[in-house]
């Protein structure tokens, strides 16, 4: 079937039958992801004018790479499958675009050549591509993970094996998954004396997506490692805290209710977005994008999120406290009136971030 996104029209496998067992995988749900990718590429080229080359490392139908080529990037589309590379060539020709199509193992290509921007968007975990992607990237590495159950702690052992961290299935599980992914990528880059800093990240529709800007040198890589640490969380009263470092030192019990705490990590505790870059990406969202309104709304929320490592869900808190929920704007305003920083988050309509702890939140928002 044919699909139009942005400035291009491509042929993709029939859906919904296509999946991991199909010859060429295409996910229509990821149109928002691809729209934001195009906007991010436009914004990054303005941020770093010397960049020009882009690798779609796991191309499949090639829709992401074709869209990059339509935005004047010197694009390489890579896939190990014959049907996929044939489809990539067909889709480039259909749109009268020039790009290089490579039938290759993505890891082999990324170990042998380097690109200004590398995009790794596989089915499932990106970790099998992580080392090669770091070595094959000059400036910006874009990564998608769709294995949200391991990332978020729902499939605990798989998460530990894949990401080298202890994930926990908390009420902020989407953010947990994002920060576990970032931790794994930051640690991978640091092994090569590279600082990989997220300038845009979001957890949307059962996937996590991040854009990591590279800086080279042992010192800056060490600075990134310093932003890893652990979150300690109480499942009973929802209290949580975090500390930095690669050695966990959790409190013995919850300081509020004295119940047992769960510890997750090492995860990324630093910023997941650069607000200035997020704003620049939003300005590059254009009307021909099918998810333009949704993308702008998401980016506006991301840009306004305060910098704390976890978020809360008002409905879950109020249920624990035995009181009714209220309008989010009113709830957040109460926190601000009490002197705390607070913002909505993109993780859900009833989620928020604040520098208040769970006891302070309850007191500040009481009637």
Curated annotation (Swiss-Prot):
Its EC number is 2.1.1.216. Transmembrane segments: none annotated. Residues 1-365 form the Trm1 methyltransferase domain. This is tRNA (guanine(26)-N(2))-dimethyltransferase. Belongs to the class I-like SAM-binding methyltransferase superfamily. Trm1 family. Keywords: Metal-binding, Methyltransferase, RNA-binding, S-adenosyl-L-methionine, Transferase, tRNA processing, tRNA-binding, Zinc. One of its GO terms (biological process) is tRNA N2-guanine methylation. Dimethylates a single guanine residue at position 26 of a number of tRNAs using S-adenosyl-L-methionine as donor of the methyl groups. The keyword Transferase applies. The keyword RNA-binding applies. Pfam families: TRM (PF02005). InterPro entries: SAM-dependent_MTases_sf (IPR029063), Trm1 (IPR002905), TRM1_arc_bac (IPR022923), tRNA_met_Trm1_C (IPR042296). Zn(2+) binds at residues 234, 237, 254, 257. It catalyses: guanosine(26) in tRNA + 2 S-adenosyl-L-methionine = N(2)-dimethylguanosine(26) in tRNA + 2 S-adenosyl-L-homocysteine + 2 H(+). NCBIfam families: PRK04338.1-1, TRM1. GO terms for molecular function: tRNA (guanine(26)-N2)-dimethyltransferase activity; tRNA binding. S-adenosyl-L-methionine binds at residues 34, 64, 79, 105-106. It comes from the Archaea.
């Amino acid at each position: 079937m044919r699909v139009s996104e942005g400035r291009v029209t491509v042929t993709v496998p029939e859906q919904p039958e296509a999946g991991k067992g199909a010859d060429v995988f295409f996910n229509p749900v990821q149109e928002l992801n691809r729209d934001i990718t195009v906007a991010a590429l436009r914004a990054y080229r303005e941020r770093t004018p010397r960049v020009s080359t882009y690798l779609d490392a796991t191309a499949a139908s090639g829709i992401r790479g074709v869209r990059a080529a339509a935005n004047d990037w010197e694009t390489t589309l890579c896939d190990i499958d014959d049907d996929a590379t044939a489809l990539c060539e067909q889709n480039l020709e259909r749109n009268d675009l020039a790009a290089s199509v490579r039938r290759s193992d993505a890891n082999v290509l990324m170990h042998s050549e380097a690109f200004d921007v590398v995009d790794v968007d596989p089915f499932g975990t990106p970790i099998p591509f992580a080392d090669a992607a770091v070595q094959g990237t000059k400036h910006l590495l874009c990564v998608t993970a769709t294995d949200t159950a391991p990332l978020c702690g729902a499939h605990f052992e798989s998460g530990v094996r894949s990401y080298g961290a202890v994930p926990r299935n908390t009420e902020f599980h989407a953010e947990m998954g994002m920060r576990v992914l970032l931790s794994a990528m930051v640690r991978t880059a640091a092994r090569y004396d590279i600082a990989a800093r997220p300038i845009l990240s979001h957890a949307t529709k059962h996937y996590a997506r991040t854009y990591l800007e590279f800086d080279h040198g042992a010192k800056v890589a060490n600075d990134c490692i310093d932003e890893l640490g652990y979150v300690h969380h109480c499942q009973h009263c929802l209290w949580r805290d975090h500390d930095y470092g690669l050695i966990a030192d959790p409190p013995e019990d919850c300081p509020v209710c004295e119940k047992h705490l769960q510890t997750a990590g090492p995860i990324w505790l630093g910023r997941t977005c650069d607000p200035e870059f997020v704003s620049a990406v939003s300005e590059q969202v254009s009307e021909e994008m099918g998810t333009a309104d949704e993308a702008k709304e998401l980016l506006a929320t991301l840009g306004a999120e305060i910098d704390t490592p976890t978020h809360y869900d008002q409905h879950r808190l109020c249920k624990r406290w035995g009181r009714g929920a209220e309008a989010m704007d009113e709830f957040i305003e109460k926190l601000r009136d009490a002197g705390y920083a607070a913002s909505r988050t993109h993780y859900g309509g009833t989620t928020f971030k604040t520098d208040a702890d769970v006891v302070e939140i309850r007191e500040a928002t009481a009637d």
